[in-house]
Each structure stands twice: as C-alpha cells, then as structure tokens.
UniProtKB/Swiss-Prot annotation:
Note: Heme 1 (or BL or b562) is low-potential and absorbs at about 562 nm, and heme 2 (or BH or b566) is high-potential and absorbs at about 566 nm.
Residues noted as binding a ubiquinone in the record, renumbered to the chain: 202
Full protein name: Cytochrome b
Entry GO CC: mitochondrial inner membrane; respiratory chain complex III
Record-listed heme b b562 binding positions: 82, 183
Organism encoding this protein: Starmerella bacillaris (Yeast)
Amino acid sequence: MSIRKTNPFISMANSYVMDAPEPSNMSYFWNFGSLLGVCLVMQLCTGMFLAMHYCSNLDLAFISVQHMMTEVNYGWLLRYAHSNGAGFFFMFVYLHMARGIYYGSYRKPRMALWNMGVMMFLLMMMTAFMGYCLVYGQMSHWGATVMTNLVTAMPYLGQAMAEFIWGGSSVSNPTIQRFFSLHYLLPFVIAGICCLHLLALHSHGSNNPLGMTANIDRMPMHPFFLFKDTVTIFAFLFVYFFLISYYPEYLGDPENNIPGNPLVTPAAIVPEFYLLPFYAILRAISSKMMGVLAMLFAILILFVLPFVDFSIIRGNAFKFLSKILFGFFCVNFILLGLIGAMHIEVPYIIIGQLATIFYFSYFMILLPLISILENMLFYLAIKR
C-alpha cells in the first residue's frame, strides 16, 4: 500500500488533499478556499520577514518602514506583497462568504463551519486594522485615534478602556508596541481556527451548487479539483505580482506616506477599502455608542444567519425571489463601501443610512419573510 495511506502524518494530509471525496458538480466558486489558504501562508511569511526589520517605537516606526523600502534587499517587495496581499485576502473572504450565503453553506450540518469562518473574519479585521496602524503614517495615526476613541462610547468603563489600550492619554508609544505584539500573534490564532475550519469541513464534506447531499456522486480531490484550484491560484498570482510590480500603491492611501502628525488632521480619515462597508455603517448613525454597536452587530449578525433562514431548500439555485434579494444585498454592500469613502455630507449621509437599514433588514426581516413565502409557494406547487 502507498506510503501516503499508511504513514500516520502523511495519511492525514492525503485525506484532505488527495483522496477527499468532493461533489462532482462543484464550480469555480468553490476555489476561494484554496486561494485564501495561499493568501494566509503568504501573509504569514512576508509578515515574519518584515517583523525582522520593523521597530515598534513611535519615533522609529515610520523610519523603519522607509528603511525596509530603501535599504533592505527586496524590502519594497516584501512590504508591497504584505500590504496588497491583505487587500486580496479580504476580497477573497468577501467572495467566499457571498458564495456561502448564496448556496446556503451556513445551514445544518455546517453551522460550526460557518461560525468558525465568521470568527476568523472578525479576527482578520482586528489584525488588519492594527497592521495598518503600525506604519504610523498620517492616515495610520488618525485611523488609530478615531477607531480606539470609539471605545469611549462604552458607558462607565469607556474612558478607562481607551486609556488601557493607548497606554496613556492618547495614541502613543505603548499603543504601537501593543498593536505590533497583537498583530504578530493574531495571524497564528487565525491559522489555528483555520485548521478547525478544515476539520469541520472534513466531517460533513463540501456543499455543492444544487444544495443537495451528493454522497452518491463524488470524485477524489486529486487530480480533478486540485488542478482546478491550481488554475485559479496561478491566475491570482499573475494579477498579484503585476499589481505589486507596477501599481503597488494603487490600493493604499498616498497620505500614509507622510509621517504621523497629531497636530495636523487629514482632510478625510478613511480606512482601507476592505473595511469601508462597516465604516459606512458606523458613520450612518449620529449617536457614537449606537454607531459602534451597529458596526459590531453588522459582523456578529452573521452568526444568526442559520437561524433566520426558514427555507426547506438549501441555497438559492432554485429560488427566484431569493436570487433577486441576494442581488440587491450584494449591490447594497458595494454601495456601503463606496459611501464609506465619501465625505460626510448630503446626499451621502442619507444614502448611507438607507443602505445600513437595508443591510440589517436583509438578515432580520427580508430573508425570513422571503424564505417563508417560498416555502408556501413550494407546498402549493406540490399540491397541484
């Protein structure tokens, strides 16, 4: 018998990569998992090399980044690979989650799989925010100031919590050191949850475009789906290296190339593009505390998704109304991202508020109602 089946360590990898039985009708929408795995490995590797040259001191942080760019061999490549890799990482996460929502991958028996994915998403946002602050450019400083100030919205303990995070009365040297420590640690926590995510996936197998149990029609992972994953990985790497070679600052903010100055406020404080939808939700509510809660619940509401979908059919492949509703949700999410980058003025304030209302209505009102309506139509069709 082959060593890949007899060796206790290799056989474990074999059961995931080689002989894993997968539904034969899986499309390219199921390739985002492998792309995310590649992104995670690249972020870990580039991050470790960057940490060797980074100095987590408020006065030296920006200088150390410029030192990497100009005096470290291929330091510019490492930095741009890491910063642009984060952008691709989030793009694939959003597409991965959109596919899961469309095809009902959050429903039983894959609820644990979905919940661990949402946990990873929450940790990713925390990690990305702290990493962005470590550059300590102008936008990094003010982004850290604005976002950490949101903690003060907490009743009674808010100011004390903010000062605990800052290590002083404002963003200062202890803040950068704490962010660096956590930014280095959290990716390994994400990698650990990713392993649990794979275990949960392996216990019930992958979903498929039809949303049906496909135990009678499966094929091994190798060579069919492994080759399909390889195609998209090479396509991604081509776009990725093209971007970091020719347009490395395209996804960033030029103002972050200026050293952080607490005495000069930028014209507009805007986070990275992958955090803009939730930033728009934060700004849509005038109350500071309610805005913070809305932004937090915009992520946590994904945990309740398995409980608000009452449809008897998994996925939207055969549900016309759900397809239309999901299309509106995707357009609304993109609109939130665009509004998050705009100045706080009319008509962007009103559009942001309407988009925020629709975002929460999709999960709490529209999805349950549409699923109940489609169940009724389904039963009526059976009786005929």
